[in-house]
């Protein structure tokens, strides 16, 4: 199953003592690992905000939330989760792709 996740920094929690260069590097490294493993299919940074949109390919919503919960920003308590929604191919628009 694929899930779309909209994540941002919790501004009330993301102070300079928590949001260090090492933490940012750890977050980026973990996203790269999950992309390499195929758990994260796509990752986009919003142009107008400190936020990202991820597409995860996992067994269910619980696994999706577990993956997000294990991200360094989440562990540090600064990751806000706005949307977690299951998505599927739009077969009427792309019939050749069908169900994944």
Where are these regions (language model features)?
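Conserved, structured core segments of small domains
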Residues: 1-100
């Amino acid at each position: 199953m694929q899930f779309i996740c909209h994540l941002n920094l919790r501004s009330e929690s993301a102070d300079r003592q928590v949001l260090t260069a090492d933490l940012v590097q750890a977050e980026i490294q973990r996203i790269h690992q999950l992309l390499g493993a195929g758990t994260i299919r796509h990752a986009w940074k919003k142009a107008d905000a400190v936020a990202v949109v991820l597409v995860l390919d996992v067994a269910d919503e619980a696994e999706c939330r577990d993956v997000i919960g294990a991200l360094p920003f989440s562990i540090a308590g600064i990751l806000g989760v706005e949307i977690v929604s299951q998505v599927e191919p739009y077969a009427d628009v792309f019939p050749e792709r069908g169900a994944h």
